[in-house]
Structures are given as C-alpha cells and as structure tokens.
Curated annotation (Swiss-Prot):
Family: Belongs to the TrpA family.
Single GO molecular function: tryptophan synthase activity
Pathway membership: Amino-acid biosynthesis; L-tryptophan biosynthesis; L-tryptophan from chorismate: step 5/5
InterPro entries: Aldolase_TIM (IPR013785), RibuloseP-bd_barrel (IPR011060), Trp_synthase_alpha_AS (IPR018204), Trp_synthase_suA (IPR002028)
Subunit record text: Tetramer of two alpha and two beta chains.
Lineage: Bacteria, Bacillati, Cyanobacteriota, Cyanophyceae, Synechococcales
Pfam families, per the entry: Trp_syntA
UniProt keyword annotations, A-Z: Amino-acid biosynthesis, Aromatic amino acid biosynthesis, Lyase, Tryptophan biosynthesis
The protein, known as: Tryptophan synthase alpha chain
Length: 269
C-alpha cells in the first residue's frame, strides 16, 4: 500500500466527512460467548449502521481493560477462542462484511507469532487495522511499516496524561485514525467524560491530518452526542455494548447488539 489515504479506514472517514457524519465504531470481544455468535454480531452491527468495528482478541492479562471487557475475554478464552480461530471466523465473512474491522490485540500474542506473520495473517483474514494498547511508541514505529506493507493501519493511542510533545509524535505516527482515550485508567462506562478531552480533540486535529476517534468511557447516546459536539471524527463504544450483549439471551445477542448500535447511530449523525 503506497499511503494511508488508500486504506479502507481512511476512505470511510473521508466519506463520512463529506456527509457531515461521525464514525460509529463499536467494540466487541471475539468469542464471547462464542465465535459463531461473534460472526452474527458483526453482521448485525454492520446492518445497524456501524462504520467500522473494533474486534478484541481475547488475552489473559488485558491491562487496559476494565471489568466488563476482562470478563468477556475470560469467557471467550474459556470457550476455546484463539487468535487463529478469530482470524478464521473473520475470513469466513469475506463477501458479507464490507465495513473495516480493526483488531484490538495486546503485544504478547502479536510478538509470539511475530510482527510480520501476524500482519500477514490479519490482512489475509480481511482486517483493515490494528490497535495494540500496550505497545510502546518506539515498538509501534517498528511495527507500522510492516503493517502498512500488508495494507493494515496501525492505530496509536493518546491519553489525557500523554505529554504534549509525545502526543504530537503519536498523532503523526498513527495510521487510519488516532485513538484518544477519554479518561485515565481502564476501559469502562462513565456517566460523565473529562471535559479536557474536548481540547485534546482539537489539539490532535491541528497536529495531524489523521482523524481522531474517542474511546474508553462512552456508555450511550449522551456521550456519543458529546463526543460529536467536540468535533471528533469517531466514537468507540465498548463496555456498554459488551455488557448489553452479556445480559441478552443466547439467541438474541446479535439482535440486541444491533438495536443498541441503531440507537447510537442516530446520536452520531
């Protein structure tokens, strides 16, 4: 791939910008409750208006995740979910799933396979990007060109505690979009969001042309509207969706996920 401009993630953001809309980006844990349900949920989210999806690869020590997503990862691992099986499931949806899928994985599983092989396998399965929350910037700068060769955007994270100089460097290095963590700490729902994030959205947009998506702590319609009012290009909703899915009966998980996504979609437009 010659540049990030031609990536499916970049193209989706460009389309949304022309339409004056914000990207809705749900997160779900692959394999919770099992991979066949995950496949159904991905298609349900697409039908309900999700612009792209973050797909978590379950890991036993998820440092960035709060209790809801940790529990989802534990359920997925108990069900026998492995990175290989996640990619096989994703590959089986080629031809049906047209929205970009961004894999959310910790560095340990990625490094166990090897950066180059992992990126090859992810691209072959149809992924469009990667988020590796515990990967230091220096390692990310090594991984990014490897990912880009396979047509994958390596999305980097910025937190409210990130020093200003480093924030600019991260925004310049991120591909697809910059993932702005809206709160300090782990993922999870929040009733209010740190107002400082609004200033960070604008600072990031000034330091790099790459879109800015806000995640961690977005629990529903009100937060999605708030993020949109700040001028963010995308809103990532994880724990609230995972919790909604966990409380649904097995046969209605995909329908519940789609219903919640539809509610959020209206707020993002």
């Amino acid at each position: 791939m010659s540049s990030q401009q031609s990536s499916s993630i970049a193209l989706r953001f460009e389309q949304l910008k022309r339409e004056g809309r914000m990207a809705l980006m749900p997160f779900l844990m692959a394999g919770d409750p099992d991979l066949s349900v995950t496949a159904e949920v991905l298609l349900s989210l697409q039908a309900a208006g999700a612009d792209m999806v973050e797909l978590g690869m379950p890991y036993s020590d998820p440092l960035a995740d709060g209790p809801v997503i940790q529990a989802a990862a534990a359920r997925a691992l108990a069900a026998g979910t492995t990175p290989k099986k996640v990619l096989e499931m994703l590959s089986s949806l080629r031809g049906q799933l047209s929205i970009p899928v961004i894999l959310f994985t910790y560095s340990n599983p990625l490094l166990n396979v090897g950066m180059e092989r992992f990126c090859e396998q992810a691209a072959e399965a149809g992924a469009s990007g990667l988020v590796v929350p515990d990967l230091p910037l220096e390692e990310a700068e090594r991984l990014s060109p490897i990912a880009e060769r396979e047509g994958l955007d390596l999305v980097l994270l910025v937190a409210p505690t990130t020093p200003t100089e480093r924030m600019g460097r991260i925004a310049q290095s991120s591909r697809g979009f910059t993932y702005l963590v809206s709160v300090t700490g782990v993922t999870g729902e929040r009733s209010t969001m740190e107002t400082r994030v609004e200033g960070l959205v604008q600072a990031l947009k000034q330091s790099s042309p790459v879109p800015v998506a806000v995640g961690f702590g977005i629990s529903g319609v009100d937060q999605v509207r708030q993020v949109r009012s700040w001028g963010a290009d995308g809103a990532i909703v994880g724990s609230a969706l995972v919790k909604r899915m966990a409380s649904a009966s097995l046969g209605s998980v995909a329908a519940e996920a789609g219903l919640f996504c539809s509610e959020l979609r209206k707020a993002a437009d």
